[in-house]
Every structure is written in structure tokens, then in C-alpha cells.
């Protein structure tokens, strides 16, 4: 029984870590094309850049940037043109500020 609980814990504990994001240089290899807006009110998602990949998260905008695309949960491409983006981001200073403003786009990062 303890073994089963341990296995379940290992499987589901990964769901609570910050999202590992890889920034691609080509739009065609990205899962999501994003644009960074200048004002918070323009954003679909407010993102906090975590320094810790094990920071609790449930698709709430806490991102940890990785150097390898194979360890990433999602690959994003930062575009310079807002009209090309499927998701508009605003980077926040504090973790508690992170979160979705347009929840209809949450599926993009699952």
C-alpha cells in the first residue's frame, strides 16, 4: 500500500511544479506564440519568472525558463508583432501578481 501511495505521489507531484518554458528562435517550432505587452490591462496572462523550477504552480503564470527544449513543458516564441501572437503576456515583479486575465486561453498552456 505504501508503495502505491509513493508511486501516485511521484506521478502527481510534478503537476504542482512551475511550468518549464523554453524560448524558441523559430515560430514554427513553438507550441504558443506570445507577445509581451507594455500594460497589464492588455495581457491575457500575467507571468512571474521563477528562479526555482519546483515552485508550486497550477497553470497560474509561474514560469521557469529552461535551456533545453526537451525538458520544457511548453515551447514559446516571442514575436515582435502583437497580431501574430496567440497569447499576450505581461511580466510581473511578484509571484502573487501572476495569473490569468483571460481564462478562455488557459488551454494553450496545458
Label the predicted regions.
Residues 1-21:
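Bacterial Sec-dependent N-terminal signal peptides
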Residues 17-110:
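Repetitive, compositionally biased segments used for assembly/scaffolding
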Amino acid at each position: 500500500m505504501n508503495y502505491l501511495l509513493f508511486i501516485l505521489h511521484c506521478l502527481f507531484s510534478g503537476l504542482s511544479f512551475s511550468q518549464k518554458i523554453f524560448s524558441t528562435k523559430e515560430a514554427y517550432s513553438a507550441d504558443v506564440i506570445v507577445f509581451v505587452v507594455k500594460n497589464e490591462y492588455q495581457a491575457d496572462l500575467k507571468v512571474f519568472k521563477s528562479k526555482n523550477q519546483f515552485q508550486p504552480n497550477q497553470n497560474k503564470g509561474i514560469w521557469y525558463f529552461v535551456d533545453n527544449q526537451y525538458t520544457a513543458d511548453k515551447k514559446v516564441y516571442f514575436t515582435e508583432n502583437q497580431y501574430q501572437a496567440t497569447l499576450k503576456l505581461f511580466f510581473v515583479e511578484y509571484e502573487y501578481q501572476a495569473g490569468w486575465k483571460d481564462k478562455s486561453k488557459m488551454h494553450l498552456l496545458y
